[in-house]
């Protein structure tokens, strides 16, 4: 991506933030995990913080977020760190995190990817709070999406809850994540093709009118994004 393309992308992002209902601040770039305190002060001045991560995401970014908070004088509670083994978006983790956070007068900072983000998203909503997220992998496209996908009673369900008020993605951390996570994110990009077709059909039958701004934001750069060869993935043929 050249300088012009980067500027065009950021212009689109800024316009999207102006229209967004939930997310109001976004920082993406190299080394920006160090700006976690900056965003927290912008969005939650005067509040305490509490980092929520798993064992892996704590190592790759959680400790850096904590250092950023400490160096800025932000008071933070003891971080809540899930075990990495067999950790997924299950209701039992919702209950355990809720039990911990409801006794803390603090704003959660989700440090991780889809599972951590959705878990903190729903629990924060249940407690009537907002939160921010620091991403650790480009494994999906729902960091700033409304709703959380959680397994409850044996079924994956989507629960209504607002997106994070702020989101940070450090590109160096994302690039260093396991390659299968990037492949998962690439699959989410591919899903934009049938999603676009669904929206066209919904518009045609009068169910959901296409919003031209949202359409262009998602679809205009999709072909270029999908044309990037995933050189780090082995290709095998039968």
Can you describe what each PLM-predicted range is?
Residues 1-107, 177, 184-187:
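ATP/NTP phosphate-donor binding region
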Residues 18-20, 43-44, 100-103, 124, ...:
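Solvent-exposed alpha-helices and their adjacent loops that cap or buttress functional pockets
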Residues 53, 112, 169:
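Short beta-strand/turn micro-motifs composed of small residues
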Residues 61-63, 119-121, 143, 178-179:
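Short glycine-/acidic-enriched loop or helix-start segments at secondary-structure transitions
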Residues 101-137:
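A short, small-residue-rich loop immediately preceding and capping a beta-strand
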Residues 125-224:
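A glycine/threonine-rich phosphate-anchoring loop and its flanking beta-alpha core
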Residues 220-238:
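A conserved active-site cap/scaffold subdomain adjacent to cofactor or substrate pockets
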């Amino acid at each position: 991506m050249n300088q012009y393309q980067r500027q065009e992308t950021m212009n689109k992002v800024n316009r999207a933030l102006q229209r967004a209902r939930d997310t109001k601040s976004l920082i993406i770039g190299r080394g920006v995990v160090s700006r976690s305190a900056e965003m927290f002060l912008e969005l939650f001045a005067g509040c305490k913080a509490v980092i929520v991560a798993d064992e892996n995401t704590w190592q790759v970014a959680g400790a850096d977020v904590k250092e950023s908070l400490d160096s800025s004088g932000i008071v933070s509670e003891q971080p809540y760190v899930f075990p990495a083994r067999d950790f997924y978006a299950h209701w039992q983790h919702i209950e355990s995190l809720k039990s911990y956070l409801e006794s803390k007068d603090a704003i959660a900072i989700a440090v991780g990817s889809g599972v951590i983000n959705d878990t903190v998203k729903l629990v924060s909503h249940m407690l009537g709070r907002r939160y921010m997220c620091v991403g650790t992998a480009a494994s999906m496209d729902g960091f700033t999406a409304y709703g959380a996908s959680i397994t409850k009673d044996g079924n994956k369900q989507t629960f209504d809850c607002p997106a994070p008020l702020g989101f940070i993605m450090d590109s160096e951390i994302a690039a260093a994540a396991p390659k299968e996570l990037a492949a998962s994110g690439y699959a989410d990009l591919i899903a934009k093709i049938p999603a676009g077709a669904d929206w066209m059909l919904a518009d045609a039958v009068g169910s959901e009118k296409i919003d031209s701004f949202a359409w262009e934001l998602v679809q205009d750069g999709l072909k270029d994004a999908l044309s990037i060869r995933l050189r780090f993935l082995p290709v095998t043929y039968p």
